[in-house]
Amino acid sequence: MKKLLLKCTTAVLCILIVVSFSACGTNETGEENSDSETISVSSNDGEQDTGKRVYFAAPLFSQSEKDYNLKLTKVHEDYGYEVFLPQRDGYLAPELEGKTEEELTQMIFEKDVSEVLNADIIFVVLDGRVPDEGACVELGIAYANNKRCYGIKTDARSVELNLDLNPMISGCFTKVFKDYDGDKLIEALEQYLSENEL
């Protein structure tokens, strides 16, 4: 019961964040507020639009997570996708020196939102007892902006009531690749990419 409550709470929080984000800068009538702060989103001016820009959303807090993220990113790049991997392509340590926690949080948030909006596709690692909260927010932003959404899952811990994922999360995806053997999942992803475009 606690697991189900935690899953529901996580889903509600993700939905609230997405709804709050989509309402930023508007008042109750839907008009833009002149006094609200906005996030500057740069377009890829001058870059050729291939439809193959991927934002890779995943937990990146342990070495094993980072290593697996790099393996999956390499598979995408081997098939011609341009991947933004936050652990690799985000801010460099010197850019973050001397910043307050609030400044760091805002910088990372704005960078990641901008990259999600500039992507054509979001690819989300759904492993963990519950999917990573940041990845769920990024998924919500991508889904709300009509991005193509794909996920992978190798972790069996959250299987409950024959629902592997919360329906509010799984409903966002075009396809979720599942295999509890990470190497077999990579093989399945390679097979899919050799026959299909994301």
What do these predicted ranges mean?
Residues 20-23:
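C-terminal motif of bacterial Sec signal peptides marking the signal peptidase cleavage site
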Residues 25-198:
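Conserved catalytic or regulatory cores that recognize and/or transform ribose-phosphate-containing ligands
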Residues 10-18:
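Hydrophobic helical h-region of N-terminal Sec-dependent signal peptides
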